[in-house]
Amino acid sequence: MRSPLLASLFALALSIASSEAAISSTEQVPLSGSVPQLDHSELQNVRINKKRPLKGRFLHITDIHPDPHYKTGSTFDSGCHRKPKKDGKSEGKKATENERGNEDLDDKEFDTLIKNEDLAGKWGTAVSDCDCPMSLVNITFDWLKEEWANEVDFVVWTGDNARHDIDRRIPRTPKEIFDSNRMIVDRMLDAFGRDMPIVPSIGNNDIYPHNVLAAGPSRITEEFLLIWKHFIPSEAAHVFERGAYFSVEVIPDRLAVISLNTLFWYDANTLVDGCRDHSNDPGALEMDWLEVQLNNFRQRGMQVWLTGHVPPHMNHYYDNCYLRYGDLALRYQDTIVGHLFGHMNVDHFFFIDVDELEATSELTSTSSNTTLSDLPLLHGPRLPRPGPGKYTAMGRSGARKLEEELRKDFGQMPGPGILKLKDYAVMNVAPSVIPTYYPGIRIFSYNISDEEDSFDQGHSYQGADELLDDEDEGDELEELELPSDNGFFGGLDERENEDIEILKGSGGHRHDVPKGDCSLPSNEDKPHCTFKRKPRHYSKRSPSRTNRALSPLGYTQFYLPSMMKQKKRPKWEVEYTTYKVKTLVPSSPENTTQPLPVPLHLLPRYDPSIFSKPKNKTEEKEVAKKTAKFYKAVKAVTPYRMKDLTIGSWVKLARMLVLEKKRWKKFAELMLVSTETD
């Protein structure tokens, strides 16, 4: 079930691919002669301080896109770089009578000026093509430092730390891109300190020109090795120089994060050639490296998060790269605890499954010279690619198309008696800090309740070597939990109950297609046959399938809904959370071994008096009112109420989204970070 490469929603168009490739050759050719030796002693031996108590949380932040040229009151057509002309002629949608000052305007007048004249706001402009002003960068990192510096165990940071190249008058340069990345590194270190494991990955706008990156060693890989010297382990330096990917043990001997260079798999990168087996293509070599990493971590009984910039949507990866990534995601399901990506700016999740890879394999066999973007899809969303010319971040019609196709894909999943969880991997795509919609940031929580200082063998998953057959595994989904009449959205109507019964008994159309006989040479390379030949590691007892040590438990998404208020500094607020209310506000928090997913004071309508004993009846009534408002506000940000983020929980959520219209409407709203769009 595929949401093919939806990054086309917001991907930068290569206006003149050949000329950009020519330009790139001056920047990205391998260094001739001997490669200048970097002082690898500057690189950090990246390890978490074992004495630092685990909090069971981590941050995922992506697509910051800081723009030092951003000007408040500038026009959108100038990339938010130039104000309207004094004669009333403007590069933007509307012109002002003159460049009037705004220092003497009150808040309401200033808000009206910006809104009515359709100009760039002080804190950024939601639902626009403009990048992040430094004011937005500053309030973001100030908030992270204040609220999360001592409340997370590590940071996942999935790229794009330079502005888009949308203003021909101020073209980007390699120096500006590197300086922009250095600046964000400095903000990260200021917010979290040098003892915090921070795992960055390279984005398609972190290079010049955007999208295209050749294999290293190159000036780009060497520069990023220096820029990220505080984050890359010294033993990973030589691999990073060649490929710009690495791994970090964020909890030594227990949990690792792998930073992937997805640009080697990205089909907009014209300097690479996919992931052909037994080739020296940089994408293939990265896949080989990734498999070795996963195998090594598995042998050590560790768990792994896979992180990168461009998500593995079928339409944005070279076909053979998509197949190889899906192959590894499923074959190492008991080792990979989750997949985190950015790039898209649209909040969503999707699945890679065996049938999806099977359909992809059928398509690729029709032509050896075409990528999936040129082939008709059997299923899943196919979104229009942006045409040449000005980059358009919005693509709001494309976002709606994505919504429709995700709904179709989720609705075609087989019923609980048919679906096998071992055949599924879940991809999570986070929203961006850049206000394509409202800015978004995620705080995940993961299970540390089974002994914080030593995940003993009784609780932690050690990676059994047993290979279980379909009929032996018995991993059918538990029955769907239907919402009660007093649930978040109320009961289901009669039609929706009929839909549930239908889905319990049957699957989507592509699951009914018989698979080829693996004994025939013509079928030996098909995914379902490959899985029978290669070692495949899955287990119901693994953290990706059962809530145990290191399992992902949920996340809370914060956003900036007040960013369009011009003079008042906006505050990060909870947009939604995947948890149940009782998980966020347990009846006896002092008795829980797992820290709260979100500090209570960050929840909406929090008041400390709620959790103190009233002194008299008058105070008791006031506390009761505050308590009722608090719980109502918390319920409003808990639309999903998932017990955890294991694969089975994601599958159940996908079912419920398509079976309940109000719940899907909420999901569609959250995809756009609760931003009202046309």
Curated annotation (Swiss-Prot):
Its main location: membrane. GO terms for biological process: polyphosphate catabolic process. Keywords: Glycoprotein, Hydrolase, Membrane, Signal-anchor, Transmembrane, Transmembrane helix, Vacuole. SUPFAM superfamilies: Metallo-dependent phosphatases. GO terms for molecular function: endopolyphosphatase activity; exopolyphosphatase activity. InterPro entries: ASMase/PPN1_MPP (IPR041805), EndopolyPtase_N1 (IPR012358), Metallo-depent_PP-like (IPR029052). It catalyses: [phosphate](n+1) + n H2O = (n+1) phosphate + n H(+). Processing by proteases in the vacuole may be required for activation. Residues 70-109, 504-547 are annotated as: Disordered. Residues 529-543 have a biased composition (Basic residues). Residues 87-103 have a biased composition (Basic and acidic residues). It comes from the Eukaryota. One of its GO terms (cellular component) is vacuolar membrane. It is found in: Vacuole membrane. Residues 24-678 are vacuolar. Glycans are attached at residues 138, 369, 447, 591, 616. Gene3D superfamilies: 3.60.21.10. This is Endopolyphosphatase. It comes from Cryptococcus neoformans var. neoformans serotype D (strain JEC21 / ATCC MYA-565) (Filobasidiella neoformans).
